[in-house]
Design a protein with these regions (language model features):
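Conserved ABC transporter NBD signature motif
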Residues: 39-50, 54-55
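Q-loop/switch helix immediately C-terminal to the Walker
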Residues: 65, 70-86, 92
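Conserved ABC ATPase "signature" region
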Residues: 90-105
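Conserved ABC ATPase signature
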Residues: 109-118
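Hydrophobic anchor residue at the start of the ABC signature
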Residues: 123
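ABC-family nucleotide-binding domains
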Residues: 137, 143-144, 148
């Protein structure tokens, strides 16, 4: 990604492009996991270069291909997310667990989940964490139709809620 600059208002933003076009790299930069060649990142008045931990505490990003949390159970992962984000909404979590049919998986280790169930887990965390900036990379891949409809309904709510920014990267508009 060269000569890229963005300032986004709260709501929902779609980053669309084909495979290998830099969508995931952009998400990693916005999450503070990949250094930009130039420029600065700020969320909620906190600059990444000045306060990296405070910045990351305002950003939700889960790389679904990562094995970083695989040894945790789903329930332990969600508890970890709850501890990390002060604005975590337990009621939204319960709604997401129900809407994404995650209850049967809460005691399973993440490495035991199918790709779709792992994605559902990270979506439940995203929808309930309360982060100022939530990054979703191809959130509908490997999901069943019921879960896609549920996730779209939560994204529609997020679009109307102007106190947070959601960035969705995908191949096409959902």
């Amino acid at each position: 990604v060269c000569d890229f600059s963005v300032q986004a208002a709260n709501g929902l933003v779609l980053v669309r492009g084909g495979g290998g076009r830099g969508k995931t790299s952009l998400m990693c930069v916005l999450a503070g996991e990949l250094a930009a060649d130039a420029g600065q990142l700020q969320v909620g008045g906190v600059w990444l270069y000045e306060q990296p931990e405070a910045y990351r505490q305002q950003v939700f990003w889960a790389e679904t291909r990562s094995a970083a949390h695989d040894a945790l159970t789903c329930g332990d992962y969600l508890a970890k997310v709850q501890r990390h984000y002060p604005a975590f909404d337990e009621a939204r979590l319960h709604r997401a667990i129900e809407g994404l049919s995650l209850a049967p998986h809460l005691d399973k280790n993440i490495f035991m989940l199918s790709t779709g169930s792992k994605r559902k887990l990270y979506l439940a965390a995203a929808f309930s964490c309360g982060a100022a900036l939530t990054l979703l990379d191809t959130p509908f891949a490997a999901l069943d139709k019921v879960s896609i409809r549920f996730a779209l309904s939560l994204l529609a709510e997020a679009e109307q809620n102007r106190d947070k920014l959601w960035v969705l990267a995908d191949y096409a508009q959902p």
